[in-house]
Amino acid sequence: MYSVFANIRTVGDFFRSIKWAWQRATKGYCDLDAYGVGDWFLNTLPDMLESIKNNRVGFPSVLLEEGMEHYGLKSMDEYNAASEELRNKIDDYGNEKWGEILSEMIFLLREANEDTCSKVNPYEEEYRRVSEEFRKKYGEWGEKLLTEEEKAKAKKSGSHPIYLPSHLPEYKEIIELYLEEEYKISEYQAKCKDKALEMFSKWFDSLWV
C-alpha cells in the first residue's frame, strides 16, 4: 500500500497524513484512498497478490481437478488411491499453475498503472525538449505568437488565443509522434486493466493465503 507520508511538504501535510494513517488503521481506508479508488486499487492490489503468492499454502480445487486430468485421473477416489509420488506431481502441478495465475494478475495490474508500466514513450525526451523550447521562445501559451490584431482584441476581452507547439510546423511532427505513442500505451494499459479485472473476478473466492 502506498504511504500516506510520501509527499509531506508542509505542517498541514503532516497533520493530514496523521489523519489518513488513523483512518486506515480504524476503518481500512482513508480520504486519500477515496480521492482516487482506481489509483488506490492499482497501487495496492499487486503487493497484496504478491503476498498471497509468496505465502500460499494451497491452491484452488479447480486446479487440482485440472492436475488430475493432466495425469489421467478421473475422480478423487483415483487420486486418493494413487501413489504418493503421483499425488505430489498433481499437487505440484496445481501449485505451479496457481503461482502462474497470480503472477499474471500482478503483471497485468502493474502494466495498467502508468507509474509502473514497462512501456515507455520513445519520444518522451524529445517532447519535453521541444515543449520547454517553445515555452522559452514563445511563452507558456504562445503569447509571443499573437498578431497585433489578436493583441488588440485581447486588451478588450481580457483573453487571447492559445498557441501550442503543435501549431508550429517545426514542432508538429514530434508532437504528433508523441501523442500517437501515448495513445498506444493508454490502449495497452486499458487492455491490461480489463484482463486483470476479468481474472480478479474469476479467482475472487480463491484470493486468500
Tell me the role of every PLM-derived stretch.
Residues 1-204:
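Long, non-globular targeting/processing and low-complexity regions
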